[in-house]
C-alpha cells in the first residue's frame, strides 16, 4: 500500500519477525513512519494477517497515540480507495476504534478497570485530580507529624533534629520528595527498606570490596586518563624542544605511575599506590640555550597534575575502613527511621484516597503491576494468570520512545510480552534473569519473542521524571544486528530532516564530546547521523554559526557619549544576548524582498522567503530568560511569543485576585489588603491609606478601617476595638477631619467585603470567583488594559483551577487558598495562558524539552553560557535509584555535620548523570534544525577562556573526558571542540592567540565563529553631519528679520495641497470595506465608509445581550478553522470538537450554542466536505495583502492625478484547497438568505479579490469559487 521508498534499514525495522527487535532511530530518521508502516504490514499480511486489536502499541503521549491512529486510519482508507471491496481493510477500519494504541497509563488503567475485582478498590473509583492530591498529601503528612510528636517517637524526633533545620517543613519536603522518588520503583516499600539496610553493616564490613569503592576508583580513572594525556603531551614537547631533555626522566616516572594506576583492578592497591607516591623533583639545571617557553609550559602542566593527584590522595586518605564503618553504623537508625516514616506517610495517604474511592497517577502503574505479577516459591517475580492471558491476546507489543521508560513500565511490559525469564532482587536491585520459568500451564506457541522497541537513547531527556535510559542501553549493548537472532537490533541513523551542514556540524561536535562517561554512549562514526534529506542545488546551505560575547567587555564613557547612550543603557547579560539574537533575526528575515534567508517549504515544494514563524529560539530553561528576550525582540519590531511554564502567579491580575480571595477569607492581613485597596477594585490613593493608618499604628489595617466604619455609622465599639483606642477623642477628631469622600469609600468597601465573605460560604469556589470578576468589574478592566486578551485568559485559568478544585472532596475558600499557595511554591506554577495559534507569524521561544519531536527551519540555541542547574546536589539528603540514600552525617550532641562518605559518592554519581542528561538535551536542541543553526552564548573573560580551550586540544579526535566532566555550561563543551577546527583560525587570529595548534581538525563540517561586543549592540550612532545641519538651520532662522520671511509664512500657511482628496483615503482597506463601497447607493460617497466614531460603554459594563449576527459569524468561522473533517463522522464527533474549543478557551459555553453540529455535519457530508477530505493541500484562514490601483475602488478621483496611486487590500481567506487541475476557493457565510442572486452580487467583489490574491501568492489557477451558506445548508458557485 505504501508508495514510500524505504531504506534497507527501515525495511528491516518494518518486516523483521519472530524476535525481540530494538530499533535505534536517530533524530529525523522517520521512526513514527516506520512504526506505523510495521503495524500496517502486520494487519495486511497476506500469509499471517493480525487484527489491529491484537497489537499493543504504547506511546509516550496521548497526542502521539492519536496521530498514530490517524495515520493508520488514513493508510487503510487509501487502501479502500484502491480496493473498495476489501473485507480485510473494512474489518481493520472497524477494529481501529477499539485498537490498543495508547499511552502506558491508558493501558494500565484499562487493565485495572477490567480486573478491579482482584484488588481492594471500588469499581467506581476515579483518578485523583492533581489539586486534590496535593491537599491530601499535605493533610496526611501534617496528621502524621502531629501523631509522632504526640507520642514522642524517638527515631522521629532524632530525624527532625538532624534534618529539619529550624522548621519541620524541611523534613516534610524530604519525605514527600522521597515518597515521589520511591514510587518510580516497581516495589516502593521493598526499595525503601533495602536502601536503609545498606547502612546496616556488620563487623566483617570491608569498604574496599563494595560497589562504592569500585565507583570511586572508576571515577578517578577518568581523571587519570586526562593526566596521562597531559604528561604524554609534555614529554612530546620535551623531546622536540631545545635544551630541556633533562626533564625527560622525572616526567617518564610520573607517566609510568599513572599507567600503573590505570591497570589496577583492586581498590586497596589503587588507594595504596596513590597515597605512597611522591613526585620526583625536577632537576635545577640551567641551560642558556633552553627553550624557556616550552620549559615553562611543561612545568605548568606537571604542576596541574601534581595538584590534582594531591587532591585525590587527600580524598582516598579519608576512606579508612574503620572510620567508614562507624559512619554507616551511626547513620543506620536515622535512615531506617526515614524509610519507615515514608512508608507510614504512604499508608496514611492511601487511607485518605480509599475513603474517597480515589487513585492517583502513580497508583495507575503500581495497581496494574500488582495485577500482572505473582511470586513463585523461590520469591521470583513472574507473570500472573491475567498477564499470561494478555500474552495470548497480543501478537506483538510495540513500544515507542523506549528510551524514556522507567523500571515500573519495563516490568509491566515484560509481563504482557512473550519473554522468557523472571525478575528478582539482587543486592537490593531488581534484576531481570532471562531464564525459563515453570508455569502451571504450558505456553504453547507463546515462546516466540514479540517485543518491538523503538527510540533513541541520545534523546533520553526525562531522567528528572525517573526515566531510566539504562534500560535501552542494556539491550542496545546486548542485542545483535545479525539476522535470525531472538534479540536483534536495527539502526536507523539516516536523517531525513536536516541539511548536510547541520548534520555534519552535529556529528563533529558530538564525536568530540559525547562518551560513555558523559552521555552514556560513545558517539562514534557508527552512531553518527547520515544525510537523508535533499534540498537541491537552488539554494546552498550555510555554516553553523557560533556567536560569542565577552561579559567583561567594558565600554568607556567616551564610547557611551559617542553612541548617545545613557549609563542606564548598560545592559545585563541576558539583555545583551537577547539583543544579539534580535539582530541575527533581522538579518535572517531581511525585508522579505531581498537579503533574507530562503527556506524550502515542503508544502509548496519550493523555496520561499524566511518568515518569523520559521524561527525558534531554544533555551535550557525559559523562566528568567524568555521575558527579557521577548522585550528585546519586541523593541526591534520582531513579533515574538514565549511558551513558558512559569510566571503565572507573578502576573498583576492574578496577584490582585488572589489577594482579594485572601482578605475575603481573612481580612486581618495587611499586605494582601493593601494590594486590593490600591488596585482598581477599591481605588484608594496613597494619601488616603496614610490617613486610615493614622487611626492606630499598632493594629491591622483592616481594624483601622473597621473602627472608622463603626464610628462613622454611629455604631458602638465592642470591647475588642475599645481595647485598642487609647484616646477616643483623638480618634474621633481624626475621623471628623477626614473628608466625606474617603469615609464613604471606606464604608462602601467594608460593606462589600462583608457581603463577599458571606457569599463565599454559600456557593462553590468557581462560581464565587466568577461572581467577583463580574461584581468588581475586574475581568472587564483587565481586558481593557494592554495585553488585555492575555490577562483575561489568565483570569479564566484561575477560574478553571477553581472549577477543578470544586469537583474534589475539599471545599471552602481557605483550602483553595492553601492549594494555590502550595502550587506557587512547588512545581505547580504554570506559564501564562496560551492565546496564540500555531500559524501565527511570530518567532517562538521555548524550552529544549518542549521542542522534542518538533522541527524548525531555523533554530537559535541561546543561553549556552548559563551554568547547569546543580542545586539539587546541595540538599542534606540525596537519593539515587541504585545507590540509595546519601545523607549528611549529623551528630546533634556534638553539634557537627558534614557530608558522609556515601553522600559524596552519590553526589558525584548524580552529577555525572546530570551532565549526561545535559549532553543529550544539547543533542536534542541541535537536531531540531532543518536548514540553519545558530548558537549564542556569553563568556566570562574571553581571552582566558579561549586559552583554556586551546590547552585542551591535545587530542584532535576528542575533547578530554576530564574536561567534559568538569564542564559547567554548554560552551565549556562546544568551545574546546571548535577551537581546534579549521574554521576557527580567523577567530583565533581575531583574539590574537599566539599559541600554535598542532592538531587542527580538517573536518567537513562548516562553522562560522563570531565575536561580538557590547558596542555593536548599542543604539546606532547619531550622524555628526545631521547634528551640524540642524544647528546651522537654527542659527540661520534666528538671524532672519521679520520682513524677510513674513510673506513666505503667509504663502505657506495658505498653501492648498494638490492631492488633498487622497489625504482622506486610507492606504489599506479590508476586503469587507471594499465590498461595502461597491454596494453603496450611487448617491453616497466614499466618506460614508468611515463613520464618525461612537463611544460606547465597555462590554463588561453593559447589560448581558444576545449574541449578535456578527459575533455568530465570527464563532462559526473560528470553529470551521479548527474543524478536523477526518474526525467528523457523526454529530457526537462534532460536539467533541466543540467541547475541545471550549476547554482550550477559544470560545465560551454560551458562544458554543450558536454552532449547530447538525449543520456542520451536513457540510462535512456534502460535496465540498468530501472534496476537502480528498485534497492533500488544504489551507484555512490564510491572511493576505495585495496592491491594486486606487482608481479601481475610488472611481470619483481625478484619473490623471491619481493614475499611479496604489492601495493595499488585505483580508483573510476562509479556506482553499488544491485539486489536480487547480485551486478551489471557499468562503463561509452565515447571513440570512432571501435571494441567492442578491447574495452572489453582495459578495462577488470580495471573492474576486480573494481569487486575485491566491493567483498572485501561489501562482496557480483558481478553477472554482464557492460561497457556503449555513442558513440554507448549501453552496453557490461564483462565476
From Swiss-Prot:
Protein's UniProt keywords contain Protease: no
Amino-acid positions noted as binding ATP in the UniProt annotation, renumbered to this chain: 25-32
UvrD-like helicase ATP-binding domain mapped to chain residues: 4-499
GO biological process: double-strand break repair via homologous recombination
An annotated GO cellular component: cytosol
Keyword tags: ATP-binding, DNA damage, DNA repair, DNA-binding, Exonuclease, Helicase, Hydrolase, Isomerase, Nuclease, Nucleotide-binding
Record text on subunit structure and interactions: Heterodimer of AddA and AddB/RexB.
The protein's name in its UniProt record: ATP-dependent helicase/nuclease subunit A
Organism: Clostridium botulinum (strain Okra / Type B1)
Name of the encoding gene: addA
Amino acid at each position: 500500500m505504501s508508495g514510500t521508498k524505504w531504506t534497507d534499514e527501515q525495511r528491516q525495522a518494518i518486516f523483521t519477525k519472530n524476535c525481540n527487535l530494538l530499533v535505534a532511530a536517530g533524530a529525523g530518521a522517520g521512526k513514527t513512519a516506520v512504526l506505523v508502516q510495521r503495524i500496517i504490514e502486520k494487519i495486511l499480511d497476506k500469509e499471517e494477517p493480525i487484527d489491529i486489536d491484537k497489537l499493543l502499541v504504547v506511546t509516550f503521549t496521548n497526542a502521539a497515540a492519536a496521530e498514530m491512529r490517524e495515520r493508520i486510519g488514513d493508510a487503510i482508507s487509501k487502501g479502500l480507495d484502491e480496493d473498495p471491496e476489501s473485507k480485510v481493510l473494512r474489518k481493520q477500519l472497524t477494529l481501529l476504534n477499539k485498537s490498543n494504541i495508547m499511552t502506558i497509563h491508558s493501558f494500565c488503567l484499562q487493565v485495572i478497570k477490567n480486573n478491579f475485582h482482584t484488588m481492594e478498590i471500588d469499581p467506581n473509583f476515579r483518578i485523583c485530580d492533581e489539586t486534590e492530591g496535593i491537599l491530601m498529601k499535605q493533610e496526611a503528612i501534617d496528621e502524621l507529624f502531629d501523631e509522632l510528636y504526640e507520642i514522642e517517637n524517638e527515631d522521629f524526633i532524632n530525624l527532625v533534629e538532624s534534618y529539619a533545620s529550624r522548621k519541620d517543613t524541611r523534613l516534610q519536603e524530604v519525605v514527600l520528595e522521597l515518597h515521589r522518588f520511591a514510587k518510580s520503583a516497581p516495589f516502593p516499600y521493598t526499595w525503601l527498606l533495602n536502601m536503609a539496610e545498606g547502612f546496616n553493616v556488620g563487623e566483617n564490613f570491608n569498604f574496599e570490596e563494595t560497589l562504592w569503592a569500585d565507583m570511586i576508583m572508576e571515577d578517578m580513572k577518568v581523571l587519570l586518563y586526562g593526566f596521562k594525556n597531559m604528561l604524554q603531551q609534555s614529554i612530546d614537547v620535551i623531546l622536540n624542544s631545545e635544551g630541556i631533555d633533562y626533564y625527560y626522566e622525572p616526567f617518564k616516572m610520573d607517566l609510568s605511575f599513572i599507567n600503573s594506576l590505570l591497570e589496577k583492578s583492586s581498590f586497596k592497591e589503587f588507594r595504596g599506590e596513590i597515597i605512597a607516591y611522591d613526585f620526583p623533583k625536577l632537576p635545577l639545571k640551567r641551560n642558556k640555550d633552553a627553550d624557556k617557553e616550552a620549559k615553562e609550559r611543561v612545568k605548568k602542566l606537571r604542576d596541574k597534575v601534581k595538584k590534582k593527584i594531591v587532591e585525590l590522595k587527600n580524598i582516598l586518605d579519608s576512606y579508612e575502613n574503620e572510620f567508614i564503618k562507624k559512619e554507616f553504623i551511626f547513620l543506620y537508625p536515622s535512615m531506617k527511621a526515614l524509610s519507615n516514616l515514608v512508608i507510614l506517610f504512604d499508608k496514611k495517604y492511601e487511607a485518605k484516597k480509599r475513603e474517597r474511592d480515589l487513585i492517583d497517577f502513580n497508583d495507575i502503574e503500581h495497581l496494574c503491576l500488582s495485577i500482572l505479577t505473582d511470586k513463585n516459591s523461590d520469591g521470583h517475580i513472574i507473570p500472573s494468570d491475567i498477564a499470561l492471558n494478555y500474552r495470548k491476546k497480543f501478537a506483538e507489543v510495540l513500544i515507542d520512545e523506549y528510551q524514556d521508560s522507567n523500571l515500573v513500565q519495563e516490568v509491566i511490559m515484560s509481563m504482557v510480552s512473550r519473554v522468557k525469564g523472571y525478575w528478582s532482587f539482587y543486592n537490593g536491585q531488581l534484576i531481570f534473569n532471562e531464564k525459563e520459568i515453570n508455569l502451571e500451564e504450558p505456553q504453547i506457541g507463546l515462546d516466540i519473542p514479540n517485543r518491538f522497541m523503538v527510540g533513541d537513547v541520545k534523546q533520553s531527556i526525562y531522567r528528572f521524571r525517573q526515566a531510566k535510559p539504562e534500560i535501552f542501553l542494556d539491550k542496545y549493548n546486548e542485542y545483535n544486528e545479525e539476522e535470525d537472532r531472538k534479540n536483534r537490533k536495527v539502526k536507523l541513523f539516516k536523517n531525513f530532516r536536516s541539511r548536510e551542514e547541520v548534520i555534519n556540524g552535529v556529528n563533529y561536535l558530538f564525536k568530540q564530546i559525547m562518551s560513555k562517561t558523559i552521555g552514556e554512549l560513545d558517539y562514534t562514526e557508527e552512531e553518527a547521523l547520515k544525510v537523508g534529506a535533499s534540498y537541491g542545488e537552488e539554494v546552498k546551505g550555510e555554516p553553523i554559526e557560533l556567536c560569542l560575547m565577552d561579559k567583561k567587555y567594558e565600554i568607556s564613557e567616551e564610547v557611551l557619549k559617542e553612541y548617545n547612550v545613557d549609563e542606564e543603557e548598560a545592559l545585563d547579560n541576558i539583555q545583551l544576548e537577547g539583543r544579539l539574537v534580535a539582530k541575527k533575526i533581522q538579518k535572517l528575515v531581511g525585508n522579505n524582498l531581498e537579503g533574507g534567508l530562503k527556506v524550502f517549504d515542503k508544502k509548496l515544494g519550493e523555496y520561499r522567503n524566511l518568515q518569523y514563524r520559521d524561527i525558534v529560539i531554544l533555551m535550557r530553561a525559559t523562566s528568567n530568560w524568555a521575558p527579557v528576550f521577548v522585550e528585546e525582540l519586541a523593541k526591534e519590531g520582531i513579533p515574538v511569543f514565549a511558551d513558558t511554564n512559569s510566571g503565572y502567579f507573578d502576573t498583576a491580575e492574578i496577584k490582585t485576585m488572589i489577594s482579594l480571595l485572601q482578605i475575603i477569607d481573612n481580612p486581618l492581613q495587611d499586605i494582601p489588603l493593601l494590594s486590593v485597596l490600591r488596585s482598581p477594585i477599591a481605588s484608594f490613593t496613597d494619601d488616603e491609606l496614610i490617613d486610615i493608618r493614622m487611626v492606630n499604628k499598632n493594629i491591622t489595617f483592616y481594624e483601622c478601617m473597621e473602627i472608622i466604619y463603626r464610628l462613622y455609622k454611629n455604631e458602638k465599639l465592642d470591647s475588642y476595638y475599645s481595647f485598642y483606642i487609647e484616646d477616643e477623642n483623638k480618634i474621633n477628631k481624626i475621623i471628623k477631619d477626614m473628608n466625606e469622600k474617603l469615609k464613604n469609600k471606606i464604608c462602601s468597601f467594608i460593606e462589600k467585603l462583608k457581603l463577599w465573605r458571606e457569599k463565599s460560604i454559600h456557593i462553590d469556589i468557581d462560581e464565587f470567583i466568577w461572581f467577583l470578576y463580574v461584581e468588581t468589574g475586574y475581568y472587564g478592566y483587565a481586558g481593557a488594559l494592554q495585553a488585555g486578551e492575555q490577562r483575561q485568559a489568565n483570569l479564566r485559568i484561575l477560574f478553571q483551577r477553581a472549577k477543578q478544585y470544586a469537583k474534589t472532596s475539599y471545599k471552602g475558600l481557605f483550602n483553595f487558598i492553601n492549594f494555590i499557595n502550595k502550587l506557587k511554591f512547588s512545581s505547580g506554577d504554570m506559564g501564562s495562558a496560551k492565546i496564540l495559534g500555531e500559524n501565527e507569524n511570530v518567532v517562538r521561544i521555548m524550552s529544549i524539552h518542549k521542542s522534542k519531536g518538533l522541527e524548525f527551519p531555523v533554530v537559535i540555541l541561546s543561553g549556552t553560557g548559563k551554568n547547569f542547574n546543580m542545586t539539587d546536589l546541595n540538599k542534606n539528603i540525596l537519593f539515587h535509584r541504585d545507590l540509595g540514600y546519601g545523607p549528611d552525617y549529623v551528630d546533634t550532641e556534638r553539634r557537627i555535620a558534614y557530608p558522609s562518605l556515601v553522600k559524596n559518592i552519590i553526589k558525584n554519581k548524580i552529577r555525572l548523570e546530570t551532565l549526561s542528561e545535559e549532553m543529550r538535551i544539547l543533542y536534542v536542541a541541535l537536531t531540531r534544525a532543518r536548514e540553519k543553526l545558530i548558537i549564542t552564548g556569553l563568556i566570562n573573560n574571553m581571552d582566558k577562556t579561549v586559552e583554556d580551550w586551546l590547552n585542551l586540544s591535545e587530542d584532535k579526535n576528542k575533547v578530554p573526558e576530564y574536561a567534559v566532566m568538569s564542564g559547567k555550561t554548554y560552551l565549556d563543551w562546544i568551545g574546546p571542540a571548535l577551537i581546534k577546527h579549521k574554521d576557527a583560525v580567523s577567530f583565533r587570529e581575531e583574539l590574537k592567540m599566539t599559541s600554535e595548534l598542532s592538531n587542527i581538525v580538517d573536518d567537513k563540517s562548516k562553522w562560522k565563529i563570531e565575536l561580538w561586543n557590547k558596542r555593536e549592540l548599542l543604539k546606532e550612532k547619531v550622524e555628526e553631519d545631521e547634528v551640524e545641519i540642524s544647528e546651522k538651520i537654527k542659527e540661520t532662522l534666528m538671524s532672519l528679520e521679520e520682513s524677510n520671511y513674513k510673506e513666505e509664512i503667509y504663502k505657506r500657511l495658505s498653501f492648498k495641497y494638490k492631492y488633498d482628496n487622497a489625504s482622506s483615503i486610507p492606504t489599506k482597506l479590508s476586503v469587507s470595506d471594499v465590498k461595502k463601497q461597491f454596494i453603496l447607493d450611487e448617491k453616497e460617497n466614499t466618506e460614508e465608509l468611515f463613520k464618525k466614531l461612537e463611544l460606547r460603554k465597555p462590554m463588561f459594563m453593559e447589560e448581558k445581550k444576545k449574541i449578535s449576527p456578527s459575533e455568530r459569524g465570527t464563532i462559526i468561522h473560528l470553529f470551521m478553522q479548527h474543524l478536523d473533517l477526518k474526525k467528523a463522522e457523526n454529530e457526537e464527533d462534532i460536539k467533541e470538537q466543540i467541547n475541545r474549543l471550549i476547554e482550550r478557551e477559544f470560545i465560551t459555553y454560551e458562544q458554543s450554542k450558536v454552532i449547530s453540529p447538525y449543520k456542520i455535519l451536513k457540510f462535512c457530508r456534502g460535496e465540498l466536505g468530501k472534496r476537502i477530505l480528498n485534497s492533500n493541500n488544504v489551507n484555512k484562514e490564510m491572511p493576505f495583502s495585495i496592491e491594486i490601483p486606487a482608481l479601481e475602488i475610488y472611481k470619483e478621483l481625478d484619473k490623471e492625478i491619481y493614475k499611479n496611486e496604489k492601495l493595499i487590500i488585505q483580508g483573510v481567506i476562509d479556506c482553499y484547497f488544491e485539486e489536480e487541475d487547480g485551486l478551489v476557493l471557499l468562503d463561509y457565510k452565515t447571513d440570512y438568505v432571501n435571494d441567492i442572486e442578491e447574495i452572489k452580487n453582495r459578495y462577488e467583489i470580495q471573492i474576486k479579490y480573494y481569487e486575485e490574491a491566491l493567483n498572485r501568492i501561489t501562482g496557480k489557477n483558481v478553477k472554482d469559487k464557492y460561497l457556503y451558506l449555513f442558513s440554507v445548508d448549501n453552496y453557490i458557485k461564483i462565476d
